[in-house]
Amino acid sequence: MYKRQVTADYFHKKTKDLIVSGIKASTVVGNSFSPVNAGNITNKGFELELGWQDRIGDFAYGVRANVATLKNKVTKMHESLSSIDGATYVTYGAITRFEVGKPAWYFYGYDFMGVDSKTGEPIFRDIDGVEGITDNDKTEIGKGIADYTYGITLNAAWKGFDFILFGTGSQGNDVFCGLNRVDYNLNQLTYFTKNRWTESNRNGKTPASGATDYTKYLTSSGCVFDGSYFKIKQIQLGYSFPKQLIKKVAIENLRIYGSLEDFFTFTDYPGFDPEVTGVGNSLGVDKGSYPNSKKVVLGLSVTF
């Protein structure tokens, strides 16, 4: 006997009067930024879930999959503000921004166009048309919010054996990689060094280590990567001993199992883990936080 399930939902949520730090207070109180009801956000999208359970003799199996889309947009801000800077990267300035018409806390920086093959200097898009690259040339360079997320679960059982595979993923989100600080010599990614411009590698994709505008590169699209991924969160295989066997030793249920957790990740992101932990105005910002650990789990479940 099979069982199937289909669930579909549409959501359109409007959030009003978000509280953020945005207005600079008087110098009398330290000239810090005071909290303010800065604006409104809309989130809308679809959620779809499909499920299938069936049995063929002693073999039972099931498949469950889900996908959710999300479109996020800032629709209104406090009248005294045109935008609000968010997460910062060391002393190089803000890398996220809150602004009407954009996704909440989108990545904000210079548009990196490549490396000058003669000098190793980074090249940026000149947006304001004025000679020289300044803060006025910063623009939207990515977003930490995924276009859609998805998951899949496979399960099966046969004569005491049971198996489950669970995976999740996201698509359309970016990650700002903050692991290439020139003032810090730990945990840097090989991507930046292997692709760096040198006299013997004039086609390098990242600027020379002594480039004049290197700090601008660190807040540019050159440090923004596709954060899409699919991760197998768990693979578990177990075996439950026959009751007629274990009841002889006064055991009601006995199950042994082994699992691999967070063991397999499929992504083009060069950092430690595309599933970064940044939240709020740091969504999608990777500053080197500890990645999810790969785990091998062996277990025994006993019921007397």
Where are these regions (language model features)?
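Hydrophobic, lipid-facing positions within transmembrane beta-strands of outer-membrane proteins
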Residues: 44-50, 148-154, 161, 232-237, ...
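Membrane-embedded beta-strand positions of outer-membrane beta-barrel proteins
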Residues: 8, 50, 63-65, 165, ...
